[in-house]
Amino acid sequence: ANGTREALFSVVQALAGSEKIPGERSCVLIPNPFYQIYEGAAILAGVEPVFYQIDPATNQPDFSAINPDDLDRCELMYICTPGNPSGQSLPLEELKKLIELAQKHDFVLVSDECYSELYLDESKPCIGLLQACEEMGNFEYRNCLVCHSLSKRSNLPGLRSGFVAGDADLIEKFLMYRTYHGSAMALHHQAARIDAWKD
């Protein structure tokens, strides 16, 4: 993908927009505060953006406060870990609960991990969504996708390089969408990106 922004937008276009429950509008669950692309992607896909709050005291979301009806009609849920603007990461146990929730209610869990390599305590790196899947024995990463970018980790926002990884069935649908929507990368940019991803 040409950066996390494109990936975060495109996954909703590729994977959401149906009536999950006949006669009811589907939704995308979005953290608040949020990256504006989450909301815009949901609106343009024709699904309702529904916000879940980040507790200002803990800088952590309270997923138990999400309306169960919204979970039933949810097609996709965004998480951002480490979060922006708080910098807080979701703990492993919380990620596991979210994966179980995604499988129970059959929605796609999309983790925006563009800040995953930025943390204060170098002895405690952030746990990613796919790592949590593996801890649970979910080696197919069912219902889960992660988005990464060079923008933050390598201070290269103008290079527009990112990737999506996770559930192979979801990636296949994403790639089909991107075949017709995404733009090609210049060869000299590709060479620079390869070097940057290796650092």
Where are these regions (language model features)?
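Conserved core of the PLP fold type I
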Residues: 1-100, 117-118, 122-136
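Short loop/edge segments at beta-strand edges and connector loops
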Residues: 2, 111, 148
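Alpha-helix termination/capping residues and helix-transition junctions
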Residues: 22, 71, 108, 138-141, ...
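A short helix->loop->beta-strand "cap" motif at the edges of active sites that frequently abuts
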Residues: 26, 47, 104-108, 141-142
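Short, Asp-centered acidic motifs that coordinate Mg2+ and/or phosphate
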Residues: 76, 108, 145
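Conserved Walker B
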Residues: 113-115
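PLP-dependent aminotransferase class I/II
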Residues: 143-199
